[in-house]
Amino acid sequence: MYKGIFVTATDTEVGKTYVSCKIAETLEKSGINTGVFKPVSTGNRNDAKALIKAAKIDENTETVTPVFFKNPMSPYGASLLERRASDKIFDLKKINNAFKYFLNKYEFTVVEGVGGILVPLKQNFFVSDLIKKFNLPVIVVARFGLGTLNHTLLTVEKLKRDRQKILGVILSGKKNNNDVSVKSNALIIKKITNLSVLELGYNEKIDLEKNIWIIK
């Protein structure tokens, strides 16, 4: 089993926090001491609260999310709007120390990114750079419906170019029965990428035995 995973996504609001919580909840129920870590957040720290609740751990939101911007946008954009130097606010040393804290304290840590992999965290530093720095295997969260093929394949291609280990893709959210692409998207992604693909609708549980690739 790995020491942790990095959960990224094809876009914002595609179910990244939901999937991260489901993974943390499943691992905790399996008896695995699981930490959760969202290095940076904007708008609020509600994702950190949800992650803490899912993992059932005694941590505060400031520890789980050490870097925070009040405006709900990219961290770099928020730093410009708030007229704060992104290099000072987006403190990589602070993030690295927090990351090491979770890896040392917990058997397994679920790390959740922010937005997609090319969201700028500061000038010339993206989520993809943070993934490389942490060097954890990656799970890509994507939408079920129309348009997800392009977004998912672009994300996977970028990760492969960065030589990052990709564990698989999780399609999340509510299926639109009027969208015929929903019936074939998972299969097409699997055939093109040769990755494991899990379809996870809302309120569905993760069968860890059938989807052991999530942690191994």
From Swiss-Prot:
Reaction catalysed by this enzyme: (7R,8S)-7,8-diammoniononanoate + CO2 + ATP = (4R,5S)-dethiobiotin + ADP + phosphate + 3 H(+)
Catalytic residues identified in the record: 38
Assigned GO CC terms: cytosol
Gene3D superfamilies membership: P-loop containing nucleotide triphosphate hydrolases
GO molecular function, one term: ATP binding
Top-level class of the enzyme under EC nomenclature: ligase
Organism domain of life: Bacteria
Cell location: Cytoplasm
Pathway: Cofactor biosynthesis; biotin biosynthesis; biotin from 7,8-diaminononanoate: step 1/2
Main location: cytoplasm
Names of the cofactor(s): Mg(2+)
SUPFAM superfamilies: P-loop containing nucleoside triphosphate hydrolases (SSF52540)
Annotated keywords: ATP-binding, Biotin biosynthesis, Cytoplasm, Ligase, Magnesium, Metal-binding, Nucleotide-binding
Pfam family of the protein (one): AAA_26
UniProt EC number: 6.3.3.3
GO biological process: biotin biosynthetic process
UniProt binding sites for Mg(2+): 17, 47, 112
Binding site for ATP: 13-18, 47, 112-115
Binding site for substrate: 42
Function field: Catalyzes a mechanistically unusual reaction, the ATP-dependent insertion of CO2 between the N7 and N8 nitrogen atoms of 7,8-diaminopelargonic acid (DAPA, also called 7,8-diammoniononanoate) to form a ureido ring.
Complexes and interactors: Homodimer.
Family: Belongs to the dethiobiotin synthetase family.
Protein name: ATP-dependent dethiobiotin synthetase BioD
Organism from which the protein derives: Endomicrobium trichonymphae
